[in-house]
């Protein structure tokens, strides 16, 4: 009788589950979505959960040669092993008690501001790093010894050598900073005062006098937030090298109606030493241009993503022309969205060689400068390549004067293909970080993007060309939760040597591999449908793709993801997926409900169901109605009827490929037949269970009558009324029990409460079911 009781309870549980609305699968959802628990269980993540007295693991420095990841945090600098970040060394660098007290007396937060937050961490030479921190609103810098060779295993601070950090690190830990250390000189975009109002791009260290941008001139910098700094060669002559700063700032007056934020790219020459009579110890080659990342709209009205969040440079064969990837978000509080735009340095240089922005006319508006531009052109580095000047101090006065009053370019820099390569507007998160890896696949090279979000997830996205390489399709491969609690991802580094990704947040550091081919499945079709450039079918499993591997059994199709073409010769023609079909037999009771569970691994797959009657080869597609409800987890059948008996097939359609996931045989038992079976089994077991029956309570003896009434009343309102009658009857019976019986019942109830944590399945068939 146990199997019948199990059927009945299953039917009753589904009936009480209520209605579930079917949601259509969206095309822009991740193919695989892995929770933090799933990442841990599959051993695909390593976590450093931080120290009790530290936080803010935001400043990363990757050293592939030493196989170390250096991380600057609150009062600490860490040296993590790239293979396993659980192996690390640390340096404690707090502020003195007097500094902390001064910070507190200035009205700052003792925990969130009055500490030493590491903001600069750069390679100084072969043996030392250079580090700067906020120092409780007194910036300071020092040197970290790391040894000459990886095997030296040295990691210590030079306690006797501290420097003033003004112009290198911000005072306020909440402010962003961008820095670059080249040839012993530190280039920093930061705030240089206690109040956080004097923003500038500095060059410090080295043998030359410190140099900076013009002070208190909004045409140069207007309340900027610096993102990153990069050295990009201009030509084969090192004298032409330029430093590029990426930042966002408030739009200049007259540049935009109302208050707005603009993303910028700024340039300075590496050999700029300031002017002779004007712009002394100030940049003479500083220029800036706006970065556009927008979606073209109707009537010429574009949707702009102006809040630049992060930048990644993808190096190419030509070091002068890396591809610039930028992550942007919207400024609007109403419309929340993120985008990734891609820029070429050719377009950037074209803008810097274009017209300068100039204010003119009755409305004093910004227009392209139409007058004579002095020679050599402002913004050009002094070298033998573009002129005969040896130093910026030799430049004519008219060049310096023009550069001082015209730091901005009129034309903006548009992205490649004039639109973003990825947009997200229908989600509850925004992009914060990006790193990119260029991967060799069977049919070409692909850029795989790893995008961090403000809720602690990482998106793995590949850009795939459509008809041409200029039209790109973004395929969201995975969404991975990499921290236990939602948190903003504030730093990311990629190690192509270790094939690992490192992620930083306020709470800790996480490490995960760039590829997890086994998560896609154990069949050729599943591996092919994944369209992951890292992975290919090797004849027996979905594994890491290597260009040097044998091609005879290797299957990979990133551009089209067509398993029919690439997997049909490896398997039987009727089953090119190579996947074993799961088969089930389910029993249901007439007039009740049952649920056929079928959920594909891929979230991009669209599920549809087919029905086949017994002894009939004809299959018909199931149409959704009031009785047949399709959900993301399967098919809900309400008010079962005899004609519902048959075979149900669950199919998944993805990228034009149909895959059968499940075959379910449903047997519907009518209520009269079920009652007859129950009574027959009761009579057959009567002699064997006489003693047990005598010991049963009245509520247990009438269980079948209760159950049959429930089956015959599938309406939830009627069931509520019936349950109320059962509860009233039980209360009446308890009141009529003798006092000693009541005491024993209370003891038994107490024991039951003590055992609530035990697995209910263990005793499911050892007790009679409760009254509803």
From Swiss-Prot:
Basic and acidic residues: bias regions: 750-772
GO biological process: fasciculation of motor neuron axon; motor neuron axon guidance; negative chemotaxis; negative regulation of protein localization to cell surface; neural crest cell migration; neuron projection maintenance; positive regulation of cell migration; regulation of synapse organization
Stretches for region Disordered: 730-772
GO (cellular component) term, any one: glutamatergic synapse
CDD domains per UniProt: Ig_Sema3, Sema_3A
Keywords: Developmental protein, Differentiation, Disulfide bond, Glycoprotein, Immunoglobulin domain, Neurogenesis, Secreted, Signal
Expression (tissue specificity): Expressed at relatively high levels in brain and muscle, moderate levels in lung, bursa, and heart and virtually absent in liver. Collapsin-1, -2, -3, and -5 bind to overlapping but distinct axon tracts.
Positions of glycan attachment: 53, 125, 591
Cross-referenced Pfam families: ig, Sema
Disulfide bond positions: 103-114, 132-141, 269-381, 293-341, 517-535, 650-723
Every Sema domain range: 31-514
Family listed: Belongs to the semaphorin family.
Note on domains (UniProt): Strong binding to neuropilin is mediated by the carboxy third of the protein.
Function, in words: Induces the collapse and paralysis of neuronal growth cones. Could serve as a ligand that guides specific growth cones by a motility-inhibiting mechanism. Binds to neuropilin.
Protein name, as recorded: Semaphorin-3A
Species of provenance: Gallus gallus
């Amino acid at each position: 009788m146990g199997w019948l009781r199990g059927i009945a309870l299953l039917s009753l549980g589904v009936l009480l589950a209520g209605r579930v609305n079917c949601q259509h699968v969206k095309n822009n959802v991740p193919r695989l979505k892995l929770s933090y628990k799933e990442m841990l269980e599959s051993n695909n993540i390593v976590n450093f959960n931080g120290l009790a007295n530290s936080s803010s693991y935001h400043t990363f420095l990757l050293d592939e040669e030493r196989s170390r990841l250096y991380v600057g945090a609150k009062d600490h600098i860490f040296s993590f092993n790239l293979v396993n970040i659980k192996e690390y060394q640390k340096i404690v660098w707090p502020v003195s008690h007097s500094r902390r007290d001064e910070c507190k007396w200035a009205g700052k937060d003792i925990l969130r501001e009055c500490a030493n937050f590491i903001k600069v961490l750069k390679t100084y030479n072969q043996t030392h790093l250079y580090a700067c921190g906020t120092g409780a609103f007194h910036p300071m810098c020092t040197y970290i010894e790391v040894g000459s060779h990886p095997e030296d295993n040295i990691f210590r601070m030079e306690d006797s050598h501290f420097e003033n950090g003004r112009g290198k690190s911000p005072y306020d830990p909440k402010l962003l900073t961008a820095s670059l250390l080249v040839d012993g000189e530190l280039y920093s975009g930061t705030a240089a005062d206690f109040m956080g109002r004097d923003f500038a791009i500095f060059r410090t260290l080295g043998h030359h006098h410190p140099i900076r941008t013009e002070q208190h001139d909004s045409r140069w910098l207007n309340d900027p937030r610096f993102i990153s700094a990069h050295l990009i060669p201009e030509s084969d002559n090192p004298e032409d090298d330029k430093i590029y700063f990426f930042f966002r700032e408030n739009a200049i007056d007259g540049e935009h109606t109302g208050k707005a934020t603009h993303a910028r790219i700024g340039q300075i020459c590496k050999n700029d030493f300031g002017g002779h009579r004007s712009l002394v110890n100030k940049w003479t080659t500083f220029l800036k241009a706006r970065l556009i990342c927008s979606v073209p709209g109707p009537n010429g009205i574009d949707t702009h993503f102006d809040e630049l969040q992060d930048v990644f440079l993808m190096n190419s064969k030509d070091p002068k022309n890396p591809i610039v990837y930028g992550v942007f978000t919207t400024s609007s509080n109403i419309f929340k969205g993120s985008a990734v735009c891609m820029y070429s340095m050719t377009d950037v240089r074209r803008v810097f060689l274009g017209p300068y922005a100039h204010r003119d006319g009755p409305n004093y508006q910004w227009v392209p400068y139409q007058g004579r531009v002095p020679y050599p052109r402002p913004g050009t580095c002094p070298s033998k390549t573009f002129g005969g000047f040896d130093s910026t101090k030799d430049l004519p006065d008219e060049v310096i004067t023009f550069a001082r009053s015209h730091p901005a370019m009129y034309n903006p820099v548009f992205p490649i293909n004039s639109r973003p390569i990825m947009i997200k507007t229908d989600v509850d998160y925004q992009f914060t970080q990006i790193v990119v890896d260029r991967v060799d696949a069977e049919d070409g090279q692909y850029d795989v993007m790893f995008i961090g979000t403000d809720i602690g997830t990482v998106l793995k996205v590949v850009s795939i060309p459509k008809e041409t390489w200029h039209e790109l399709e973004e395929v969201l491969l995975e969404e991975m939760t990499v921290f236990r609690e939602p948190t903003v991802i504030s730093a990311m580094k990629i190690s192509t040597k270790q094939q690992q990704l490192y992620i930083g947040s306020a709470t800790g550091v996480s490490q995960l591999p760039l590829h997890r081919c086994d998560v896609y499945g154990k069949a050729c079709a599943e591996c092919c449908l994944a369209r992951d450039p890292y992975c290919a079918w090797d004849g027996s499993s979905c594994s890491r793709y290597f260009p040097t591997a044998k091609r005879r059994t290797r299957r990979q199709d990133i551009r089209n993801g067509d398993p029919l073409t690439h997997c049909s010769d490896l398997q039987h023609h009727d089953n090119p997926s190579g996947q074993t079909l799961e088969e089930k037999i389910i029993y249901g009771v007439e007039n009740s409900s049952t649920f056929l569970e079928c959920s594909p691994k891929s979230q991009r797959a669209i599920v549809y169901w087919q029905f086949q009657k017994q002894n009939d080869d004809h299959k018909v597609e199931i149409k959704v109605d009031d009785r047949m409800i399709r959900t993301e987890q399967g098919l809900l059948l309400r008010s079962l009827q005899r004609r519902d008996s048959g075979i149900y097939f669950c199919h998944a359609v993805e990228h034009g490929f149909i895959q059968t996931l499940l075959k379910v045989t449903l047997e519907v038992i009518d209520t009269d037949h079920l009652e007859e079976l129950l009574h027959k089994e009761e009579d057959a077991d009567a002699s064997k269970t006489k003693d047990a029956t005598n010991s049963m309570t009245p509520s247990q003896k009438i269980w079948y009558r209760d159950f049959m009434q429930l089956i015959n009343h599938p309406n939830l309102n009627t069931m509520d009324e019936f349950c109320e009658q059962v509860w009233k009857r039980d209360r009446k019976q308890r009141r009529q029990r003798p006092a000693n019986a009541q005491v024993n019942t209370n003891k038994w109830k107490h024991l039951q409460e003590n055992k609530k944590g035990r697995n209910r399945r263990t005793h499911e068939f050892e007790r009679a079911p409760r009254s509803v």
